[in-house]
Amino acid sequence: MTLCKSEQMLFALLKASLHQQEVETECLHQASVDDWKQCYLLACKQGVMALAWDGVMKLPQELQPSKGLKLTWAMAVEAYEKKYARYCQTVAELSEFYQKQGIATVQLKGVGLSTYYPNPSHREGGDIDIFTFSADKNKMSDGEANKLADELMVKQGIEVDMHSPKHSNFFYKGIPIENHKTFLNVERFPIAVQVESILKKVINPQHTALLNGEYQILTPSACFNTLFLAFHSAQHYGSGLALHHLCDWAMLVSKYGIQIPKELTDRRFLEAISALTCLCNRYLGTSYVIPGGELLADEMLEEILHPKYLQRGIAVKGKINIFVYKTKRFLYMSRINNRILYLPMWKRVWESIVIHVRKPDTIFRVEQK
């Protein structure tokens, strides 16, 4: 696909930021005030605002955006750096608390993955995903440890949502936490069962330092992250896949390559891995040779930058129009997601019916941007 000016600018900034190199400035010459504004807004939307800022700081003065935009950008970056430090402290404190109770805690994605980046505090994230298990199998099982982790929060007066078979949800010191029982939606996708069993074998937790050694946490192996990130991105295809996910993949590939266990043979999933890698090679400065995925890569990028259907801010009014829009969106998202993670259409429809029966107010609700 052909990139517009602001998209070209953003990719140039990200490539320089991720690989600590000079910015390719061809697309930045004669960039207007509006081009820079659109570049900044796109970076914010795609969850790469702080990463793009590192690229801006590599530019000569005459190619940088206006002082007003730089001030806005710098303030947003500073705010995120403070958020990142708070997340690092929180996950380290939570891990230490659990450790005293005989529970080991592995950080999934998030601040653990940020250590793959040249500037970890500029890798943006949302909630904290953890996997809790027994630190000593002679004293309690992994399942007992995972259950105890939730019970300990309840004892502190923290409300824990345990409705999901995949993970529980709670807020710890104001930060959303997902405590995983399983890594993937094994009850939903057939391929998830196979990948889940592999993930359990290759997790190999290792100690990882955060904030220049101020905190220590456990993180999974590169092989684990290869499969986990690919599956996570695949789930978001059609419903929120962003450059944020692509940058994670680029950093993984740059640091460790792609580690795919030989027992993983699902054609759709392997094509998704190829497509993600193809996009990183084209736009984010990686050079990992992998066959296939070109066509899917094109479709992925189109969906990332110009999604056909919005998840928020639906531009229609009236119950009939909203229902038609959401139905078309559901069918479209199901079709493209099925290219990577197969799920029978009857099951997707049934899941949607169950959700809306439980929460009928969501049928005609228009989510805000």
Give the ranges of each region predicted by the language model.
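Conserved NTP-donor binding/palm subdomain of two-metal-ion nucleotidyltransferases/polymerases, i.e.
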Residues: 1-126, 132-369
